[in-house]
């Protein structure tokens, strides 16, 4: 896999090639296992696992493509992802007619937040939504003059921004991080490694849930999620992260000794 990627992308650093190889290798392995299970035992119900694998192929392809086509496209891609999440939460939770103006300001916060990430202006990036927008949005709601249910709207809108924009925008900020000496993958490598860890966590939660799952977390919301699967996935992913070489480890390993 690494040799093939070296031929296709000769300018990629070794760290990036390793991360991409891990992501593609895991997906290829999962696809082969599903293919063999269908051939050996056609009656086995693997529809859920097949859907997960297809989703991960799409997500991994989009992330890898966005990262390597252009840095600018990566920022736009992640901003669009935030917009989709914001719109989904807005449509599910439901708001008053009087909240439309504040929702518009919430949408306007998305390009501003990602532009701050693009500039790597950490001081403004880290306070824009949890401080500035937390003051602007309630003010906009109050100025509308309709105070019925305003407290609920304030809380929902602020935390929709935190979840869908502030949280996801940290992925974009990874792209703006300066390269470390001895770690040539830069922010792109960190972002793709995070995608790989998320993929591993999803797989391990599914496996542990099938093996040991007894106690459901939210039966009415997600009946297939269990505490055993959740804890098994978190512990497995943490162990993998702890044993994997970090940028600091790579930098130290390549630094010349003082002897």
Language-model features: locations:
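Cytosolic, membrane-interface loops and tails of multi-pass inner-membrane proteins
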Residues: 35-45, 204-225
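Membrane-embedded alpha-helical segments that form the functional core of polytopic membrane enzymes
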Residues: 71-83, 186-199, 258-259
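Small-residue-rich segments of transmembrane alpha-helices in multi-pass membrane proteins
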Residues: 53-61, 102-115, 156-170, 225-237
């Amino acid at each position: 896999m690494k040799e093939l990627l070296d031929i296709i992308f000769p300018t990629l650093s070794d760290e990036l090639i390793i991360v991409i190889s891990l992501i593609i290798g895991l997906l290829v392995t999962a696809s082969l296992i599903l293919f063999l299970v269908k051939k050996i035992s056609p009656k086995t119900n693997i529809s859920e696992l097949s859907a997960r694998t297809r989703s991960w192929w799409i997500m991994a392809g989009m992330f890898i493509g966005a990262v390597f086509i252009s840095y600018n496209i990566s920022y736009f891609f992640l901003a669009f992802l935030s917009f989709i999440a914001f719109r989904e939460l807005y449509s599910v939770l439901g708001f008053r007619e009087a909240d439309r103006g504040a929702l518009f300001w919430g949408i306007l916060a998305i390009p501003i937040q990602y532009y701050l990430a693009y500039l790597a202006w950490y001081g403004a990036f880290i306070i824009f939504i949890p401080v500035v927008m937390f003051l602007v949005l309630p003010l906009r709601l109050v100025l509308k003059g309709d105070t019925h249910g305003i407290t609920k709207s304030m809380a929902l809108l602020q935390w929709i921004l935190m979840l869908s924009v502030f949280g996801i925008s940290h992925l974009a900020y990874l792209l703006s991080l300066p390269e470390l000496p001895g770690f040539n993958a830069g922010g792109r490598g960190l972002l793709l490694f995070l995608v790989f860890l998320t993929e591993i966590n999803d797989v391990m939660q599914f496996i542990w849930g099938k093996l040991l799952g007894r106690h459901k977390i939210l039966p009415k919301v997600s009946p297939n999620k269990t505490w055993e699967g959740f804890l098994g996935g978190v512990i497995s992913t943490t162990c993998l992260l702890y044993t994997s070489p970090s940028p600091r480890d790579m930098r130290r390993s390549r630094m010349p000794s003082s002897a």
